[in-house]
Amino acid sequence: KAQDRACVVSEKDSIPLSNVYICLKDRRVIAISDEKGVFSLEKYDSLSLNDTLYFSHINYLHKKLSYGDLIKNRCTVFLIENNRVLEEVSIFSNRHLNRFLHYEILSPLKRGVYSFASVLVDGQIYIVGGSTSCGPFQSNIRSTLFWEKYSNMMYRYDIKQDKWETIRHKFRERAYHTAGYYDGKIFILGGKRLSETRIVDYLDNAIEIYDIKRDTVWTDYTNPHQATLLGSVVYKDNMIVLGGVKKVLQNNEGVYSDEMHLWNLKSGYWYELGKMPIRQAPETILVDHCIYLIGNRNGGGRSIECYNLLTGAWANAGRLLYRLG
């Protein structure tokens, strides 16, 4: 029926009004006007001519109209704009705001180290290797003194006890590497090592495996993904490594990798996983079955890429506010 459809418009300029609520006397909403101001009552064929309809909109005065009057008005409802003057509002707060983020100083390492690999296992943080290099000293007087050294130590930090412990084993001296945890073991791979003269550095092809429960270490020399600053995640029975820097040219520019490899930690077999959309050395994090690549040291990218391990598809997950790399 024609009277089952009606329209709500502004009385001032006859502009259709959307999101007008039409209610019955019991405040039950029976219709909402669409973007053309139109609403339908065809589901309510039991309405009598004396039933009252209520029309409400946040910017207009409420109006009530009988169903009979709605039909007399040719199914058009006019609402008057509600011009309200709001009183001044003052907001007070006794909450003290800090100029800086609050932090707590915890137990320090016995010796400073950076560019190490780390894993979190049962409330304990393991860090291994890293650079202890210093220099150049007193750069204000252009000193040429420089000392480059990589660590061969592993440390364990107990979060609850705020206590550091040194693992008794000596590991390979390496830095800019990665590590992953699986089935009670820590897998350490990638990065670079120094020559005996400490003038030349080499990509480290060795994989070290530390068994936490047995407190033993063994080495595997099968690593097809040799790079520094590589990303890695552990997914189910596999360790997935991505990108990194393969070498550094004489002009100090890095040659970045777009390779991806999957290492099955049960069988020990390696598999090529394809190529990344761009060559990069990203920070990686695993969320469910997706690897998120954040930032990019190759030019300092702002994009966040996502790799779906179930479908093998790449997607752009967003952009950082600032370049990171």
Residue ranges of predicted features:
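Extracellular beta-sheet/turn segments enriched in Thr/Pro/Gly and aliphatic residues
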Residues: 69-93
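Kelch-like beta-propeller repeat domains
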Residues: 84-325
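Short, ordered, surface-exposed loop/turn motifs in non-cytosolic proteins
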Residues: 4, 11-26
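A short, amphipathic beta-strand motif
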Residues: 4-13, 37-39, 77
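Short, acidic Ser/Thr/Gly-rich low-complexity loop/linker segments typical of extracellular
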Residues: 28-40
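Hydrophobic beta-strand segments
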Residues: 20-24, 37, 53, 91
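Short Pro-Gly-centered beta-turn/loop motif in secreted/extracellular proteins
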Residues: 18, 40-50
